[in-house]
């Protein structure tokens, strides 16, 4: 696997409303654990759309991992121009910091938001252009990642496309591991 698409819950779907929420330590630890194993297997690119939450946390985690794995690259391909325009200032700043460090940045449709079709196009593009999907998602807790998952499941039926999940159980394990070592 060379290209990994990453998505998952938005912060509000997890009850996270501050960028210093303690839960982020565990979420990023779970993402890091998965990314390390993929890097060891040849991962070169992480593909995100720049969506708040899991995607930006994955990019931040990837940037931290660059100290050990300088060959790891991050591509941010947004579904449309200006997706961050209505976000609160701290979220915009986080987004801009992620973009500033990205190895590749592009807008898929080259237009501002027009319709939900742009999100469907983004999902289809990500699944087509990636070798696997990693998502922070638990089927017991439905949310926005389900649309990307549905697209990935369609592809999996035709060619065995790998889908990897970070579930609530994985997050509990990250908490327990952190507690064990502190």
UniProtKB/Swiss-Prot annotation:
Please name the Gene3D superfamilies in this protein's record.
Answer: 3.40.50.450
UniProt lists the family membership as follows: Belongs to the UPF0398 family.
Q: What is the lineage of its organism?
A: Bacteria, Bacillati, Bacillota, Bacilli, Bacillales
Coiled-coil regions listed:
none
Q: Which NCBIfam families match?
A: PRK13660.1
* SUPFAM superfamilies, A to Z: MCP/YpsA-like
Q: Which organism is it from?
A: Bacillus velezensis (strain DSM 23117 / BGSC 10A6 / LMG 26770 / FZB42)
Name of protein:
UPF0398 protein RBAM_020340
HAMAP family, A to Z: UPF0398 (MF_01575)
**Which domain of life does the UniProt lineage start with?**
Bacteria
